[in-house]
């Protein structure tokens, strides 16, 4: 087996998802993943720290896509526009990088394993904190930035769940826009109120 086989990273991902679905995450070994992908275990560890990271590799890059959209938005953009820009960029990156079928298969594996669910929640919390910091860096008050960060992650998570639902054909970006429209309707305003009051809790 070649140590640096072309497309090894993608083959390892696909092999892992297949085996997780067939045997369960806990019962699947790195050796089995490598064997199905046609590479050595050493090659596996060149790409991933462990089998869990097959499911979570790339989260830092995705987080950076979200935050870069905030930092590069027009100087006079209101906080509501920064939220929309982050969601647009992050949602498009996710759906273009892996696609709906991969996302569905990955979600099924995570849903079946409590530890993986906890890891996914930590990832989303980290994204919220990163967005909050990016909003503050753009001049938003701390409380408004924190609420906006949590709102963005909530809209993203809700849209993602709809995107991978059986029979859904709309793209993730469109579903995120739907979510933002619902938020605007619920609050009866399209703008974000900012305050200099300190964050509590």
Task: For every predicted segment, state its role.
Residues 30, 59-67:
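Short, basic, alpha-helical segments at the C-terminal edge of helix-turn-helix-like DNA-binding modules
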Residues 12-20, 66, 83, 120:
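Short hydrophobic clusters on alpha-helical segments that form packing/core surfaces
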Residues 149-169, 185-190:
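Amphipathic C-terminal alpha-helical segment
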Residues 23-25, 38, 45-57, 61:
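HTH DNA-binding helix-turn interface
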Residues 136, 168-201:
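C-terminal peripheral helix-coil segments that are non-catalytic and often amphipathic
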Residues 124-149:
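Hydrophobic alpha-helical bundle segments that form small-molecule/ligand-binding pockets
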Residues 64-106:
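Hydrophobic alpha-helical connector segments
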Residues 1-23, 27-39:
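Basic, helix-initiating cap at the start of DNA-binding domains
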């Amino acid at each position: 087996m070649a140590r640096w086989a072309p497309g090894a990273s993608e083959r390892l991902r696909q092999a892992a998802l297949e085996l997780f679905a067939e045997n369960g995450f806990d019962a699947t070994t790195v050796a089995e993943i490598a064997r199905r992908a046609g590479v050595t275990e050493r090659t596996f560890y060149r790409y991933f720290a462990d089998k869990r990271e097959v499911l979570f590799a790339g989260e830092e890059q995705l987080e950076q896509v979200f935050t870069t959209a905030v930092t590069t938005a027009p100087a006079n953009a209101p906080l509501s526009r920064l939220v929309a820009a982050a969601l647009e960029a992050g949602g498009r990156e996710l759906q273009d990088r892996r696609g709906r079928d991969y996302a569905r298969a990955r979600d099924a594996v995570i849903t079946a394993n409590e530890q993986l669910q906890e890891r996914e929640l930590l990832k989303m919390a980290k994204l919220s904190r990163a967005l909050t910091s990016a909003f503050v860096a753009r001049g938003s008050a701390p409380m408004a930035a924190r609420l906006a960060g949590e709102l963005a992650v909530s809209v993203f998570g809700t849209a993602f769940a709809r995107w991978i639902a059986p029979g859904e054909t709309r793209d993730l970006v469109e579903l995120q826009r739907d979510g933002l429209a619902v938020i605007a309707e619920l609050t009866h305003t399209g703008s974000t109120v900012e305050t200099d009051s300190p964050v509590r809790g």
